[in-house]
Regions:
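Fe(II)/2-oxoglutarate oxygenase catalytic core
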Residues: 1-192, 198-254
């Protein structure tokens, strides 16, 4: 009975993602994993950060260096996981849940012959990011400005008792669908945000004055991704700050 209820819930969320991305380009889902799982993910992320494995995030065309140039653009630290690492079982569950929603998203679009019809053929590993307070930020940017294949950004927040009025750290979006408006999203515990990765959604992380964590997965437009590989003549991992060991996982069951 519980499995049946969960599948119905996932389908309902998937329908919301289809509807909201089509209409607004953004979809926000609260209480995504449930409080208990969300707090377990929070503890796992904090524990990983405390081991010192996170590295400075990089940006296209800029190297993370002592000059501070890259830090002026983004000042987060990141690491990549696939869920098989120690103490990552609940993160693996999160990844599987998002995969299911994206698979449902594809099926719904196929059945309705609407929305994004190009097959989504893979994704990155999950990038865990930490903005370590002290005004750490990421300036206004687009995840995929140059057709590198990234189609949908899925970001999950694990920040307990977050109050943006006191600590900042808002995700501010400038959606093309609402050219006269901005959308401010607080990075609260157990909140998931889906949005188009291309130029339809410029966004920024405003200065954060408390440690701020997020987990992000990018899903690929299969055709655009292959074109990007051919164009670059290399099998690169599009996720900035990564290396070839973090290349996309194919969703062969889609």
């Amino acid at each position: 009975m519980q499995d049946s209820f969960r599948m119905e819930w996932l389908l309902e969320i998937s329908q919301c993602v289809v509807r909201d991305l089509e209409k607004y380009g953004i979809c926000v889902v609260d209480n995504f994993m449930g409080k208990e799982r969300a707090e377990t993910i929070h503890r796992s992320v904090v524990s990983m950060y405390e081991t010192g494995i996170f590295v400075e995030g990089e940006t296209v065309g800029l190297k993370s260096s002592k000059t501070g140039t890259a830090k002026n653009v983004r000042s987060d630290k990141i690491t990549w996981v696939d869920g098989s690492e120690n103490n990552c079982a609940t993160i693996a569950h999160l990844i599987a849940t998002v995969d299911t929603i994206i698979m449902n998203f594809i099926r719904i679009n196929r059945l309705t012959q609407s929305g994004h019809q190009t097959p989504i053929g893979g994704r990155t590993k999950a990038m865990i990011s930490c903005y370590p307070g002290n005004g750490s930020h990421y300036v206004k940017h687009v995840d995929n400005p140059n057709r590198d294949g990234r189609c949908i950004t899925a970001t999950y927040y694990v920040n307990k008792d977050w109050d943006a009025k006191e600590t900042g750290g808002l995700l501010r979006m400038f959606p093309q669908a609402w050219p006269t408006k901005v959308v401010d999203i607080e990075p609260i515990l157990d909140r998931m945000v889906f949005f188009w990765s291309d130029r339809r959604n410029p966004h920024e992380v405003q200065p954060s004055f408390r440690t701020r964590y997020a987990i992000t997965i990018w899903y690929f437009d299969a055709k655009e991704r292959e074109e990007a590989k051919e164009r670059n003549n290399v099998k690169t991992n599009v996720a900035v700050g990564s290396d070839e060991n973090k290349t996309a996982t194919l969703l062969s069951h889609i």
